[in-house]
């Protein structure tokens, strides 16, 4: 009944107008699973490879016809007829078929599209929501949203060097209330920026991208918006940063072009520690560059006891890199992006290793997204307690929040909002 009878890949557009892969998997009993693959702007050097066509005469070289051909050809030939409930086996077959360490031949975008669509088809066949199918009966924790309301770095055309300034409504009683708090702060921030003469255009992830001179200026605007919206910073709502430090790490130092400053590793650690001391910041992602392991260790020793330090480019959702981080006590949390590793099985293994080792996990979108809301279900399935899926604008972002609202409603009295517990000692 759950045998795979057809797989159809196609090229669709993501939220940036670039092509991406969408896959339909049809089972013998008529169940159809559909998944669309996201794409990142600031990508880690150690990520699985997203296969692009490179034909400059079509979509400026960003077409994904080769990946789609792999889905409809080689991949279907290899897994057609297999049982969709055998997720680990199906993912292993595709990884072996690819034959490279980073999925470069068939493309992580091809493999992931099939992997997620298989899980969705199996869930439908079992008449279960995806979060329940993947996570079992204990999947009932709604994550704290990390809402990216000011954008900088590679996500915006402004001088701010850090990529994201986030609010976390961890003090809310439910996910729905937390979302409302975030929306109210977002609109209050918009008015504050406008009144101060800044533009209120939004970046790739729906956050504002004002021309502010420094991280402190952005944090001050966010703090004011939290207070003006009627909430208490450091009690109701907390702050988070994604420095995306790899993007401005050159020749062994951190070059803040927007501020016109260069900070060596010691100065970078000192600066981040100072920000944590001055603001209610409970989480910093990629505060150091992806291969600056010594810097990461220094940062962890300096503020790891009082701040969540999330490895994105550092760990790239990869079990081996996370294993090294755990061994060296580097960072204390991992950002989980399904397309960084390229299959559902490997994603779940990474989250499991993190949780087993006392590291937190944050389910995450990419800057190039679609209307696909799979990561909302995966956040609940893995009970990871935190989700990062952009701002309170753009339907490619709100699609995930809306799915979490549905899940919370469906779970009813069983639903549990992670709240401050997700941040342990930090909040």
From Swiss-Prot:
Tree of life domain: Bacteria
Associated pathway: Carbohydrate degradation; glycolysis; pyruvate from D-glyceraldehyde 3-phosphate: step 4/5
Record localization: Cytoplasm; Secreted; Cell surface
PANTHER family from the UniProt entry: ENOLASE
GO process annotations (BP): glycolytic process
Positions annotated to bind (2R)-2-phosphoglycerate: 163, 337, 366-367, 388
Gene3D superfamilies in the record: Enolase-like C-terminal domain, Enolase-like, N-terminal domain
Keyword field: Cytoplasm, Glycolysis, Lyase, Magnesium, Metal-binding, Secreted
InterPro entries linked to this entry: Enolase, Enolase-like_C_sf, Enolase-like_N, Enolase_C, Enolase_CS, Enolase_N
Cofactor: Mg(2+)
Class in the EC hierarchy, top level: lyase
CC per GO annotation: cell surface; extracellular region; phosphopyruvate hydratase complex
Active site: 205 (proton donor), 337 (proton acceptor)
Keyword Transmembrane helix listed: no
Record: residues binding Mg(2+): 242, 285, 312
Taxonomic source organism: Azorhizobium caulinodans (strain ATCC 43989 / DSM 5975 / JCM 20966 / LMG 6465 / NBRC 14845 / NCIMB 13405 / ORS 571)
Protein name: Enolase
HAMAP family noted in UniProt: Enolase
Pfam family, one: Enolase_N
Cofactor note: Binds a second Mg(2+) ion via substrate during catalysis.
